[in-house]
Regions:
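A contiguous active-site-proximal alpha/beta segment in oxidoreductase catalytic domains
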Residues: 1-39
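Mid-domain beta-loop-alpha active-site segment that forms a flexible
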Residues: 3-10, 35-68, 82-83, 167, ...
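Glycine-/small-residue-rich active-site loops that bind phosphorylated ligands and cofactors
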Residues: 7, 106, 190, 245
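Short, intrinsically disordered, charge-balanced linker/junction segments flanking boundaries
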Residues: 23-24, 247-251
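A short glycine-threonine-serine/GTX helix/turn-capping micro-motif
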Residues: 43-48, 154-162
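Contiguous beta-strand/loop segments that form the cofactor/metal-binding neighborhood of enzyme cores
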Residues: 52-135, 158-161, 165-179, 196-198
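C-terminal helix-rich "cap/oligomerization" subdomain common to oxidoreductases
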Residues: 92, 170-215
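A structural motif detector for beta-strand N-caps
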Residues: 217-220, 224, 230, 235-242, ...
Length: 251
Protein backbone atom coordinates (compact mmCIF):
# COMPACT_ATOMS: atom_id res chain seq x y z
CA UNK A 1 0.00 0.00 0.00
CA UNK A 2 1.31 3.45 -1.00
CA UNK A 3 0.96 6.47 1.30
CA UNK A 4 -0.85 8.83 -1.07
CA UNK A 5 -2.66 10.47 1.81
CA UNK A 6 -4.76 12.97 -0.16
CA UNK A 7 -6.90 10.16 -1.53
CA UNK A 8 -8.14 9.72 2.05
CA UNK A 9 -8.87 13.43 2.59
CA UNK A 10 -12.63 13.97 3.16
CA UNK A 11 -12.64 17.04 0.88
CA UNK A 12 -10.98 15.13 -1.98
CA UNK A 13 -13.42 12.25 -1.53
CA UNK A 14 -16.34 14.72 -1.68
CA UNK A 15 -14.82 16.39 -4.75
CA UNK A 16 -14.70 13.01 -6.46
CA UNK A 17 -18.39 12.54 -5.64
CA UNK A 18 -19.26 15.92 -7.18
CA UNK A 19 -17.47 14.95 -10.39
CA UNK A 20 -19.06 11.49 -10.52
CA UNK A 21 -22.54 12.94 -9.90
CA UNK A 22 -22.11 15.43 -12.76
CA UNK A 23 -22.34 18.49 -10.52
CA UNK A 24 -19.44 20.14 -12.36
CA UNK A 25 -20.45 18.95 -15.82
CA UNK A 26 -17.78 17.64 -18.15
CA UNK A 27 -14.32 18.09 -16.66
CA UNK A 28 -12.33 20.31 -18.99
CA UNK A 29 -9.26 21.29 -17.02
CA UNK A 30 -7.64 20.45 -13.69
CA UNK A 31 -4.64 21.97 -11.98
CA UNK A 32 -2.90 22.11 -8.63
CA UNK A 33 -0.49 24.45 -6.87
CA UNK A 34 1.69 23.14 -4.04
CA UNK A 35 3.85 26.07 -2.98
CA UNK A 36 5.79 27.11 0.11
CA UNK A 37 9.06 28.57 1.35
CA UNK A 38 10.93 25.32 2.12
CA UNK A 39 11.48 22.66 3.09
CA UNK A 40 14.39 22.81 0.64
CA UNK A 41 15.98 19.44 -0.06
CA UNK A 42 19.33 18.50 -1.52
CA UNK A 43 18.80 14.78 -2.13
CA UNK A 44 15.75 15.14 -4.42
CA UNK A 45 14.17 17.85 -6.53
CA UNK A 46 10.84 19.61 -6.01
CA UNK A 47 9.07 17.40 -8.54
CA UNK A 48 9.79 14.19 -6.66
CA UNK A 49 9.30 15.84 -3.26
CA UNK A 50 6.02 17.74 -3.75
CA UNK A 51 4.22 16.44 -6.85
CA UNK A 52 3.46 12.72 -6.16
CA UNK A 53 0.32 13.41 -4.11
CA UNK A 54 -1.12 15.80 -6.70
CA UNK A 55 -0.47 13.33 -9.51
CA UNK A 56 -2.18 10.62 -7.47
CA UNK A 57 -5.26 12.78 -6.89
CA UNK A 58 -5.55 13.73 -10.57
CA UNK A 59 -5.44 10.08 -11.62
CA UNK A 60 -8.11 9.26 -9.03
CA UNK A 61 -10.42 12.13 -10.03
CA UNK A 62 -10.18 11.46 -13.76
CA UNK A 63 -9.94 7.66 -13.50
CA UNK A 64 -7.35 7.50 -16.26
CA UNK A 65 -3.69 8.01 -17.00
CA UNK A 66 -2.33 10.83 -19.17
CA UNK A 67 -1.40 10.17 -22.77
CA UNK A 68 1.33 12.81 -22.69
CA UNK A 69 3.53 14.27 -19.94
CA UNK A 70 5.87 17.25 -20.11
CA UNK A 71 7.64 19.38 -17.53
CA UNK A 72 9.98 22.32 -17.20
CA UNK A 73 11.50 24.11 -14.23
CA UNK A 74 14.35 26.04 -12.69
CA UNK A 75 17.35 25.14 -10.52
CA UNK A 76 18.64 28.06 -8.45
CA UNK A 77 20.15 26.76 -5.21
CA UNK A 78 21.86 23.50 -6.18
CA UNK A 79 23.05 22.21 -9.54
CA UNK A 80 20.69 19.59 -11.02
CA UNK A 81 18.20 19.99 -8.14
CA UNK A 82 15.08 21.72 -9.44
CA UNK A 83 13.49 24.20 -7.03
CA UNK A 84 10.36 24.79 -9.13
CA UNK A 85 8.63 22.78 -11.84
CA UNK A 86 5.48 23.03 -13.92
CA UNK A 87 4.25 19.69 -15.21
CA UNK A 88 1.57 19.36 -17.86
CA UNK A 89 -0.57 16.25 -18.20
CA UNK A 90 -2.69 15.62 -21.29
CA UNK A 91 -5.56 13.15 -20.99
CA UNK A 92 -8.05 11.73 -23.45
CA UNK A 93 -11.09 13.76 -24.55
CA UNK A 94 -8.97 16.95 -24.56
CA UNK A 95 -8.77 17.12 -20.74
CA UNK A 96 -5.56 18.80 -19.61
CA UNK A 97 -4.00 19.54 -16.27
CA UNK A 98 -0.93 21.07 -14.74
CA UNK A 99 0.92 20.72 -11.48
CA UNK A 100 2.94 23.68 -10.22
CA UNK A 101 5.30 22.95 -7.32
CA UNK A 102 7.78 25.35 -5.76
CA UNK A 103 9.69 25.55 -2.46
CA UNK A 104 10.91 29.09 -3.17
CA UNK A 105 7.50 30.71 -2.81
CA UNK A 106 6.72 33.57 -0.38
CA UNK A 107 3.70 31.87 1.23
CA UNK A 108 2.08 28.47 1.58
CA UNK A 109 -0.54 27.46 -0.96
CA UNK A 110 -2.08 24.04 -1.50
CA UNK A 111 -4.94 24.22 -3.99
CA UNK A 112 -6.44 21.87 -6.52
CA UNK A 113 -8.96 23.29 -8.99
CA UNK A 114 -11.31 21.42 -11.31
CA UNK A 115 -12.92 23.38 -14.14
CA UNK A 116 -16.09 21.81 -15.52
CA UNK A 117 -18.62 22.80 -18.14
CA UNK A 118 -21.25 23.57 -15.45
CA UNK A 119 -19.21 24.72 -12.45
CA UNK A 120 -15.73 24.96 -10.97
CA UNK A 121 -14.50 23.41 -7.73
CA UNK A 122 -11.62 24.44 -5.46
CA UNK A 123 -9.98 22.23 -2.86
CA UNK A 124 -7.97 24.52 -0.57
CA UNK A 125 -6.11 22.52 2.07
CA UNK A 126 -4.78 25.67 3.76
CA UNK A 127 -8.22 27.22 4.30
CA UNK A 128 -10.47 26.44 7.27
CA UNK A 129 -13.18 25.54 4.76
CA UNK A 130 -11.70 22.97 2.42
CA UNK A 131 -14.03 22.69 -0.57
CA UNK A 132 -15.77 25.36 -2.63
CA UNK A 133 -17.90 25.30 -5.78
CA UNK A 134 -18.14 28.32 -8.08
CA UNK A 135 -21.21 27.94 -10.34
CA UNK A 136 -19.84 30.33 -12.97
CA UNK A 137 -21.18 29.76 -16.47
CA UNK A 138 -20.33 30.90 -19.98
CA UNK A 139 -23.06 32.26 -22.21
CA UNK A 140 -22.67 32.95 -25.91
CA UNK A 141 -23.81 36.33 -27.18
CA UNK A 142 -25.24 36.02 -30.69
CA UNK A 143 -23.74 32.57 -30.76
CA UNK A 144 -20.26 34.03 -31.26
CA UNK A 145 -19.00 35.91 -28.21
CA UNK A 146 -18.43 34.05 -24.92
CA UNK A 147 -19.60 36.02 -21.88
CA UNK A 148 -18.70 34.93 -18.33
CA UNK A 149 -21.65 34.88 -15.93
CA UNK A 150 -20.16 35.05 -12.45
CA UNK A 151 -21.83 33.58 -9.37
CA UNK A 152 -21.07 33.48 -5.66
CA UNK A 153 -19.17 30.47 -4.41
CA UNK A 154 -20.78 27.81 -2.27
CA UNK A 155 -18.96 26.14 0.63
CA UNK A 156 -19.37 22.38 0.38
CA UNK A 157 -19.64 20.74 3.81
CA UNK A 158 -17.18 17.91 4.35
CA UNK A 159 -16.66 15.55 7.21
CA UNK A 160 -14.08 16.63 9.77
CA UNK A 161 -11.62 13.75 9.82
CA UNK A 162 -7.85 13.42 9.74
CA UNK A 163 -6.63 12.05 6.39
CA UNK A 164 -3.79 10.16 8.07
CA UNK A 165 -6.20 8.47 10.47
CA UNK A 166 -8.44 7.55 7.55
CA UNK A 167 -5.46 6.13 5.69
CA UNK A 168 -4.36 4.02 8.67
CA UNK A 169 -7.91 2.73 9.18
CA UNK A 170 -8.03 1.75 5.51
CA UNK A 171 -4.70 -0.06 5.90
CA UNK A 172 -6.01 -2.02 8.91
CA UNK A 173 -9.14 -2.99 6.98
CA UNK A 174 -6.93 -4.16 4.12
CA UNK A 175 -4.88 -6.34 6.47
CA UNK A 176 -7.99 -7.86 8.03
CA UNK A 177 -9.94 -8.45 4.86
CA UNK A 178 -7.09 -8.90 2.39
CA UNK A 179 -8.95 -6.65 -0.02
CA UNK A 180 -7.20 -4.50 -2.58
CA UNK A 181 -6.36 -1.11 -1.02
CA UNK A 182 -7.30 2.15 -2.70
CA UNK A 183 -3.65 3.16 -3.09
CA UNK A 184 -2.06 -0.16 -3.90
CA UNK A 185 1.25 -0.91 -5.56
CA UNK A 186 -0.22 -0.56 -9.06
CA UNK A 187 -1.49 2.94 -8.25
CA UNK A 188 1.95 3.82 -6.91
CA UNK A 189 3.58 2.49 -10.08
CA UNK A 190 1.34 4.69 -12.25
CA UNK A 191 2.40 7.76 -10.27
CA UNK A 192 6.04 6.71 -10.46
CA UNK A 193 5.83 6.33 -14.24
CA UNK A 194 4.47 9.86 -14.60
CA UNK A 195 7.17 11.27 -12.33
CA UNK A 196 9.80 9.50 -14.42
CA UNK A 197 8.39 10.87 -17.69
CA UNK A 198 8.23 14.38 -16.21
CA UNK A 199 11.82 14.06 -15.00
CA UNK A 200 12.96 13.01 -18.45
CA UNK A 201 11.44 16.08 -20.07
CA UNK A 202 13.09 18.28 -17.44
CA UNK A 203 16.43 17.11 -18.76
CA UNK A 204 15.24 17.78 -22.28
CA UNK A 205 14.43 21.39 -21.40
CA UNK A 206 17.98 21.76 -20.14
CA UNK A 207 19.23 20.74 -23.58
CA UNK A 208 20.53 17.43 -22.23
CA UNK A 209 17.67 14.99 -22.82
CA UNK A 210 19.09 11.89 -21.17
CA UNK A 211 21.79 11.53 -23.75
CA UNK A 212 23.60 8.24 -23.55
CA UNK A 213 27.34 8.21 -23.97
CA UNK A 214 27.73 6.20 -27.18
CA UNK A 215 31.26 5.29 -26.16
CA UNK A 216 29.78 3.25 -23.30
CA UNK A 217 27.55 0.21 -23.43
CA UNK A 218 25.50 1.47 -20.48
CA UNK A 219 23.79 4.66 -19.29
CA UNK A 220 24.41 6.62 -16.07
CA UNK A 221 22.08 9.48 -15.15
CA UNK A 222 23.84 12.79 -14.53
CA UNK A 223 22.69 12.89 -10.90
CA UNK A 224 24.37 9.54 -10.14
CA UNK A 225 27.99 8.63 -9.41
CA UNK A 226 29.87 5.43 -10.22
CA UNK A 227 33.12 4.67 -8.37
CA UNK A 228 36.19 3.34 -10.12
CA UNK A 229 36.42 -0.43 -10.20
CA UNK A 230 32.74 -1.07 -10.95
CA UNK A 231 31.62 -3.58 -13.59
CA UNK A 232 28.45 -2.58 -15.47
CA UNK A 233 26.88 -4.88 -18.03
CA UNK A 234 25.89 -3.82 -21.52
CA UNK A 235 22.48 -2.16 -21.75
CA UNK A 236 22.28 -1.36 -18.03
CA UNK A 237 20.80 1.98 -16.96
CA UNK A 238 21.57 3.68 -13.64
CA UNK A 239 18.98 6.30 -12.79
CA UNK A 240 18.47 9.22 -10.40
CA UNK A 241 20.67 9.92 -7.36
CA UNK A 242 22.43 6.55 -7.21
CA UNK A 243 25.92 5.88 -5.86
CA UNK A 244 27.48 2.67 -7.14
CA UNK A 245 30.31 1.61 -4.83
CA UNK A 246 33.68 0.22 -5.82
CA UNK A 247 33.63 -3.52 -6.46
CA UNK A 248 29.95 -3.62 -7.42
CA UNK A 249 28.69 -5.63 -10.38
CA UNK A 250 25.54 -4.59 -12.23
CA UNK A 251 23.82 -6.23 -15.18
Amino acid sequence: MVGHILQYHPAVIRLKELISQGELGKVQYIYSNRLNIGKVRTEENILWSFAPHDISVMLMLLEEEPVKVSSFGGEYLNLNIYDTTLTTLEFKNAVKGHIFVNWLHPYKEQKLIVVGSKAMAVFDDVSDEKLFVYPHTIEWKNGKTPIAQKADYVVIPVESAEPLKRELEHFIQYLRGRKRPKTDGLEGLKVLNILTLAGETLLGVKGDPQKEDKSKAYFVHESSHVDEGVWIGEGSKIWHFSHVLKGSKIG
